[in-house]
Design a protein with these regions (language model features):
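One-carbon transfer enzymes
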Residues: 1-129
Length: 129
């Protein structure tokens, strides 16, 4: 366990939706953590006019000057993200990609995946519906 006088834990956050943004906000405002970057989905077309719209996590990160990165399930991009952010902790919530083992095992304090249902019984993108 870290002493409170130590530097904050360098944290990489992976997420997309509003719910994950709530946890990102809590971590961002907790002095024990420093969000070094976020990985989220690319902007997606939304609505009848198909307007490119950022994820809620990207919106939060942009508003708070946190670097945003996209991997698109590309193994090399996951390797680049580890070099770029050098996380001590990875927190993943509502992120629609299967993460490579090397990525999950990299951080000093490992990785945390929060899922809003019992796995594997209620797996998938909308497990609580």
């Amino acid at each position: 366990m870290r002493n409170l006088k130590e530097e904050p834990i360098q944290t990489l956050f992976l997420g997309t939706d509003w719910e994950s943004t709530q946890i990102l906000n809590a971590l961002y405002n907790d002095k024990r953590f420093k969000i070094t970057g976020v990985i989220t989905n690319e902007d997606k077309p939304v609505g009848r006019k198909q307007v490119l719209t950022p994820s809620k996590v990207k919106e939060f990160a942009t508003e708070n000057n946190i670097e945003v990165y996209h991997t698109n399930s590309d193994t090399e991009k996951y390797k680049e993200a580890l070099k770029r952010f050098n996380p001590e902790l990875i927190v993943c919530i509502a992120f629609g990609e299967i993460l490579p083992d090397f990525f999950i095992e990299y951080p000093k304090y490992k990785s945390i995946n929060i899922h809003f249902s019992i796995l594997p019984k209620y797996r998938g993108a909308v497990p609580v519906q």
